[in-house]
């Protein structure tokens, strides 16, 4: 079995979506079999936080990882970029508690990964690709996530908003041998989005302090506040990005059709936990 890591280090600096605080992230090559993991270089002893399902500590409007007192929030876009581009092993050094939002998508991470390229690593690994043995279904009201046995790994998502500019959207993306190219073109550029009527409430709740019209799409009853969109269905493509990032915490993607509708980070992580339990 072969794995991949970065050929060289990459770095970005920017503000976090919820904290509004600027942080610097440096992603370095890592040894075969080490996986993807964060290092809080701003804290004493530089604690390591593995990008694993067991490390999830919170899922309110983003996915947060933690180990002991150390945590890293809003990890999903960066992890989606690494997984989507085939980076199995990466040391992610960060000098704060939240990953920079950058332009609201994974595009800048993906461009940096593509610029430096990957190195192939030979590894003896007991964790091989496996098939989901039976359907998994988790729902909350009319929202759901599912993993269905399939001949390929595929991610499909549906959303439904009572705003004409969004409405009902579906999108499906397959994981293939050319996935790094298709991910970079079809999924990574899709930006996070918010609803105009929710912004004031979220800000009063201490959230989205770093959100702006430069790093998030905003939709109101009269349409998009800050067009143009990169895709006609950019919102649902971004949900695929979130799903890929959250399920990347498994370390690898089982062969299955992952399906979600009106889901959340919480439901994504519940699905990952169920898959992990089945694999054990």
Curated annotation (Swiss-Prot):
Q: Which cysteines are joined by disulfide bonds?
A: none
Q: Show the Gene3D superfamilies listed in the entry.
A: lpxc deacetylase, domain 1, lpxc deacetylase, domain 2
- Report if keyword Membrane is assigned: no
Q: Which GO terms describe its biological process?
A: lipid A biosynthetic process
Alphabetically ordered keywords of this record: Hydrolase, Lipid A biosynthesis, Lipid biosynthesis, Lipid metabolism, Metal-binding, Zinc
Q: May I have one GO cellular component term?
A: membrane
Keyword DNA-binding assigned:
no
Name the pathway: Glycolipid biosynthesis; lipid IV(A) biosynthesis; lipid IV(A) from (3R)-3-hydroxytetradecanoyl-[acyl-carrier-protein] and UDP-N-acetyl-alpha-D-glucosamine: step 2/6
**Enzyme class of the recorded protein, top EC level:** hydrolase
Q: Quick one: which residues bind Zn(2+)? A: 77, 238, 242
**Which GO terms label this protein's molecular function in UniProt?**
metal ion binding; UDP-3-O-acyl-N-acetylglucosamine deacetylase activity
Matching NCBIfam families, A to Z?
A: lpxC
| Cofactor(s) required for function per UniProt | Zn(2+)
Name assigned to this protein: UDP-3-O-acyl-N-acetylglucosamine deacetylase
Q: Name one Pfam family in it.
A: LpxC
UniProt cross-references to SUPFAM superfamilies, sorted A to Z: Ribosomal protein S5 domain 2-like
Enzyme Commission identifier(s): 3.5.1.108
Native source organism of the sequence: Trichormus variabilis (strain ATCC 29413 / PCC 7937)
Superkingdom of the source?
Answer: Bacteria
Its recorded reaction(s) are:
a UDP-3-O-[(3R)-3-hydroxyacyl]-N-acetyl-alpha-D-glucosamine + H2O = a UDP-3-O-[(3R)-3-hydroxyacyl]-alpha-D-glucosamine + acetate
Known function: Catalyzes the hydrolysis of UDP-3-O-myristoyl-N-acetylglucosamine to form UDP-3-O-myristoylglucosamine and acetate, the committed step in lipid A biosynthesis.
Name the active site residues. Answer: 265
Family to which this protein belongs: Belongs to the LpxC family.
Q: Which residues form a coiled coil?
A: none
């Amino acid at each position: 079995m072969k794995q991949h890591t970065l050929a060289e280090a990459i770095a970005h600096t920017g503000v976090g979506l919820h904290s509004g605080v600027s942080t610097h992230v440096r992603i370095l090559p890592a040894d075969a079999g080490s996986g993807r993991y964060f290092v809080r270089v701003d804290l004493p002893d530089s604690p390591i936080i593995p990008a694993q399902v067991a490390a999830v500590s919170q899922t309110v409007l983003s996915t947060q990882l933690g180990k002991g007192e150390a945590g890293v929030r809003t990890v999903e876009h960066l992890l989606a970029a690494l997984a989507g581009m085939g980076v199995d092993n990466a040391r992610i050094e960060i000098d704060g508690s939240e990953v920079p939002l950058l332009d609201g998508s994974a595009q800048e991470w993906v461009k940096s990964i593509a610029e430096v390229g990957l190195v192939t690593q030979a590894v003896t690994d007991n964790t091989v690709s496996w098939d989901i043995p039976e359907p998994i279904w988790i729902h909350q009201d009319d929202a759901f996530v599912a993993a269905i046995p399939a001949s390929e790994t595929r991610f499909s998502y549906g959303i439904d908003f009572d705003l004409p500019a969004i409405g009902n959207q579906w999108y499906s993306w397959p994981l293939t041998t050319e996935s790094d190219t298709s991910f970079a073109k079809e999924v990574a550029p899709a930006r996070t989005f918010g609803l105009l009527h929710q912004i004031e409430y979220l800000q009063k709740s201490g959230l989205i302090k770093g959100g702006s019209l430069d790093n998030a799409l905003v939709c109101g009853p009269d349409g998009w506040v800050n067009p143009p969109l990169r895709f006609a269905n950019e919102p649902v493509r971004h949900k695929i990005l979130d799903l890929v990032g959250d399920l990347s915490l498994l370390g690898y993607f089982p062969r299955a059709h992952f399906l979600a509708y009106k889901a959340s980070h919480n439901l994504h992580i519940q699905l990952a936990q169920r898959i992990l339990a089945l694999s054990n």
